[in-house]
Amino acid sequence: MARQRRSITDIICENCKYLPTKRTRNKPKPIPKESDVKTFNYTAHLWDIRWLRRRARKTR
């Protein structure tokens, strides 16, 4: 049995059922806790160099 072709109206109505409402689209996102935020420490490399230099001086 051949599959019946869906009408354009049927497809549009099907898509409209799952459109989010204005409220859910514009709902503000909750602010994450400080511990949940992942940041990249840009100065970590500089601190490592400084620490290694200081350690090298102590071992002499």
UniProtKB/Swiss-Prot annotation:
This is Protein ninE. It comes from the Viruses. Belongs to the ninE family. InterPro entries: NINE. It comes from Escherichia phage lambda (Bacteriophage lambda).
